[in-house]
Each structure stands twice: as C-alpha cells, then as structure tokens.
C-alpha cells in the first residue's frame, strides 16, 4: 500500500458539494492499494502511521504521535498514487490494485486505524472528491509498504 500523509490543522472532503468527512488537527491520509496488498499490509501500515512522531511537543520537536495529540485521520482513496510516469506524458495506473480489492483494503485500513483508537473520517471510494486542507508545517510524508 502507498500512503501520502499530510499533517493538517484542518481538512475536509466533499462529494457533489456535500462535505462527507472533516477533521480538525490530525493527518490527511491519501491511500492506494497495490497488487499483492492484504489485510495484514493494511494493519501494518495503520500501526506504523499511528506511531509516527510527526507532531510537535512542548519544546517544538516532532516527538508526538497522532493519539498523543488527540488528533484524527481523514482517509481518502487515491489510486493516482500508483502512477507510472516513466514513459510518455500520460501517467499509467495499471500498477494500482483492482477496484473491488482496493475498496476492501481502503475500508480495512480505515477500520484498522479505528481499532487503534484513532478517530477516522473518510472520503468515498471511487467518487470525484474535492479535498480541502490547511497543511500544518508543512509536513508531508510518503510511505510505501513495498519499501519495508
């Protein structure tokens, strides 16, 4: 699985002009399932993200994780994280997981975060979504479970 994390002071996602998910302080997580990903992959990624110390402590150092700050996660599916731009000018997306499997893993990932006591809001899988955010820092991280 691939994830692009942004530390935010606020974020929301809308479909057809209606806000379907919103958080204040926390992480906006764009997520993409890749071929070969499993429920175990999802659980490991959720655990890793929940432990990442990317929030400032009283000394201003990135030393706190999401739960320690009382933050939430907004999880948005984004198959374009699987883009292959190595040839031509049009990205290829054949490296993304098949839609039915990807949707199941997207939903599993949100559930895995909830099981770790992280409040979670989500987008709508496969929908044309408008995502708004106020990046805090900015802090943006790329995680790929294929990297270990």
Swiss-Prot record:
CDD domains: Dtyr_deacylase
Localization terms from the record: Cytoplasm
Entry keyword set: Cytoplasm, Hydrolase, RNA-binding, tRNA-binding
GO molecular function, one term: tRNA binding
Motif Gly-cisPro motif, important for rejection of L-amino acids, residue range(s) on this chain: 137-138
Any GO BP annotation: D-amino acid catabolic process
EC nos: 3.1.1.96
Gene Ontology annotations for the cellular component aspect, listed alphabetically: cytoplasm
Highest rank taxon of the organism: Bacteria
Enzyme class: hydrolase
Matching InterPro entries: Daa-tRNA_deacyls_DTD, DTD-like_sf
Reactions performed catalytically: glycyl-tRNA(Ala) + H2O = tRNA(Ala) + glycine + H(+); a D-aminoacyl-tRNA + H2O = a tRNA + a D-alpha-amino acid + H(+)
Entry text on domains: A Gly-cisPro motif from one monomer fits into the active site of the other monomer to allow specific chiral rejection of L-amino acids.
Family statement drawn from the similarity comment of this UniProt entry: Belongs to the DTD family.
Biological role: An aminoacyl-tRNA editing enzyme that deacylates mischarged D-aminoacyl-tRNAs. Also deacylates mischarged glycyl-tRNA(Ala), protecting cells against glycine mischarging by AlaRS. Acts via tRNA-based rather than protein-based catalysis; rejects L-amino acids rather than detecting D-amino acids in the active site. By recycling D-aminoacyl-tRNA to D-amino acids and free tRNA molecules, this enzyme counteracts the toxicity associated with the formation of D-aminoacyl-tRNA entities in vivo and helps enforce protein L-homochirality.
PANTHER family: D-AMINOACYL-TRNA DEACYLASE 1, D-TYROSYL-TRNA TYR DEACYLASE
Record text on subunit structure and interactions: Homodimer.
Identification of the protein by name: D-aminoacyl-tRNA deacylase
Biological classification of the source: Bacteria, Pseudomonadati, Pseudomonadota, Alphaproteobacteria, Rhodobacterales
